[in-house]
Amino acid sequence: DYYDSLSDHHLDIKLSSSSSIDKVNNLISHQEKILLKPLLDFLKTKKDIRLLGSYEIEDRVPTVAIVTKKSNIVLAKELNELNVSVGTGDFYAVRLLQALGVDINEGVIRLSFVHYTSGSDVEKLISGLDRYL
């Protein structure tokens, strides 16, 4: 099982209790925060990118929604050409986005991280955003 592999490799414990599963969950969460921090730091410096939600890493999960003045479709295509995969749209949150003043026709760009995302993937994303915005 995947959690057993993570536990064996990183923690050297057997997953026999909820506390050991919690340790693996904490390990995953910690890695996701490490990956997310450079992006949040970058976004803080960009006045033309609106981050939906907090810049504080402790207040976030590793999914980031941004709004820019550029067309999301165009930006997503440009990032995809750099082998950076992003999503665009409303992600079934139409009323929330409307309440936040987001143009529903444009929606948001969604950037998702998981614990096995590499640091170089994050660097490539930041470089692409910096290049195209």
List the model feature ranges, each with a label.
Residues 1-133:
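Pyridoxal 5′-phosphate
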